[in-house]
Amino acid sequence: MFMRYIMVEEQTLKTGSQELEEKADYNMRYYAHLMKLSKEKPAEFWGSLAQDLLDWYEPWKETMRQEDPMTRWFIGGKINASYNAVDRHLNGPRKFKAAVIWESELGERKIVTYQDMFYEVNRWANALRSLGVGKGDRVTIYMPLTPEGIAAMLASARIGAIHSVIFAGFGSQAIADRVEDAKAKVVITADAYPRRGKVVELKKTVDEALNSLGERSPVQHVLVYRRMKTDVNMKEGRDVFFDEVGKYRYVEPERMDSNDPLFILYTSGTTGKPKGIMHSTGGYLTGTAVMLLWSYGLSQENDVLFNTSDIGWIVGHSYITYSPLIMGRTVVIYESAPDYPYPDKWAEIIERYRATTFGTSATALRYFMKYGDEYVKNHDLSSIRIIVTNGEVLNYSPWKWGLEVLGGGKVFMSHQWWQTETGAPNLGYLPGIIYMPMKSGPASGFPLPGNFVEVLDENGNPSAPRVRGYLVMRPPFPPNMMMGMWNDNGERLKKTYFSKFGSLYYPGDFAMVDEDGYIWVLGRADETLKIAAHRIGAGEVESAITSHPSVAEAAVIGVPDSVKGEEVHAFVVLKQGYAPSSELAKDIQSHVRKVMGPIVSPQIHFVDKLPKTRSGKVMRRVIKAVMMGSSAGDLTTIEDEASMDEIKKAVEELKKELKTS
């Protein structure tokens, strides 16, 4: 059975301006107008935006076509992503404007103008051409977060190749799987890069991956960027250094069909091999550019985006590489973890470059909060207008901290919902064009124009207000939606996303709609706890726990129980100033029972840190494996291995308690 849902510490906050508040009614009516237009005339709605924001070699013959099950956009149009991101800015004042600003944990800094980026993209494109890469070939990119990684992506797009970026934290098996599936002709990598005081050897990992494939390896060449100038093994005839072949020569951009694939980005499935999500060229560029202006709020020429994501994820594709450069903005990137070498490194970067939008993950915000307020107060963060979070559910406590401490009560907190598959935000707010009243915690806001998102019950009917249901999206899907899956005839696509509700896209998330129309995404449906016939999302319990004033972070798992079905265990990280104790554990437990009812009474385990991926997602499967005494599986993406020791220690203490009780 599903529970009726009352959110913890729910608030509807004003926009912070009396003048804007007086316009609130108009703002919501304008939002309703945009939604109505995008629903009744989707071709006209998206077509006008594509014409206004992008440069096309040839106009499309058909704006939209609904197929089974995806929507095709701008059919017959000719375009090039690299030209739109770089070349078209060189005949005006953006030529010498900063396109990318980069820092490393070693203190290195680099400002890359649009003119510089044009030069670098052509160098990389020329290098790829010299290695035999052409239109339709796949190029795997395994690079740290540097301007060179961005240039390599744009160079692939320039010559019509399809890039497949792999996050630099992945291990050799993940690389081997993706390279083999994509049949990559060339792998672009770096010798090594610094991460939390250590040297991460990328070329060595690529060698291990290709060696494991043996004769199955499709790779003809490995192109190596000398990031740290370390000694690496170079296989004769296959491996080549970028500085030896990356000579500047103008490369004419390939005229691509709007529905030619721009990239493949692999996302892990719950079972089986990773899914190669394919995005088109014209549609993807249109949708991401629109949401950069509207949802990320970079609507002004001099706006600056500091994004803590990575090019190995969809956020880094959409809101580091493509849309900021498509729209001629400045994006700031930091190669290492945003809290290294000191906790307020991220705040220092915001202050130094006067970022106007700060993009980060919900998990990272919780992590920053753990260090306390003083680190933030040491910096002038007044340039920030908008804080954008995505990834995991944003609980109330970090939402409030971001608004009041980081933003001084004057920023717009825009928690978005979207996926690798959808390419750009689908739920959220529109701070770039209108201010809408914010709701706290995991409220993702409203369906964004052109995105027809609903919450349905098990039978496919609209869920009642505050009753949890399933998040779905109706066609026509926005242009930034995936075009399909690599190496798939459509069967896996339909089975994965369209088997539960027919023609409706089902991403696998729980959600609810409140009485005001706000949609709250409650977490993955496959992370459900089954307690005495009740199905409760792990994210719901985590939200209740983190609403306790002492808690910075929490991860919840279920362990089989012969009586209740599952017993809830919570691993809790405390804020500075609080110490673990049995009394505090009981107080947190009582708080959760009060918020969620007596049916939910989690066992509390205190830890100093939670195991997370380098993208900031909590590795709940790893925690559960330790609890169950089973193998933790692949740990190559873990951010801090010491977090595993924390979990093991907590489990051992639990076992001792059980023996003595």
Curated annotation (Swiss-Prot):
MF annotations from Gene Ontology: 3-hydroxypropionyl-CoA synthetase activity; acetate-CoA ligase activity; AMP binding; ATP binding
Keywords of this entry: Acetylation, ATP-binding, Ligase, Nucleotide-binding
Modification N6-acetyllysine occurs at: K617
InterPro entries according to UniProt: Ac_CoA_lig, ACAS_N, AMP-bd_C, AMP-bd_C_sf, AMP-binding_CS, AMP-dep_synth/lig_dom, ANL_N_sf
Enzyme class: ligase
Any Gene Ontology biological process: acetyl-CoA biosynthetic process from acetate
Description of how the protein assembles with itself and partners: Homotetramer.
Catalytic residues of the enzyme: D526
Function statement: Plays a role in the autotrophic CO(2) fixation pathway. Activates 3-hydroxypropionate to its CoA ester. Can also activate propionate, and to a lesser extent acrylate, acetate and butyrate.
Thermal behaviour (record text): Stable for 15 minutes at up to 80 degrees Celsius.
Pfam hit, one: AMP-binding
Family of the protein in this entry: Belongs to the ATP-dependent AMP-binding enzyme family.
Protein origin, superkingdom: Archaea
Intrachain S-S bonds: none
Taxonomic placement: Archaea, Thermoproteota, Thermoprotei, Sulfolobales, Sulfolobaceae
Induction notes from the record: By autotrophic growth conditions.
Catalytic activity line of the entry: 3-hydroxypropanoate + ATP + CoA = 3-hydroxypropanoyl-CoA + AMP + diphosphate
Protein name (record): 3-hydroxypropionyl-coenzyme A synthetase
PROSITE patterns (alphabetical): AMP_BINDING
EC number(s) from the headed UniProt entry: 6.2.1.36
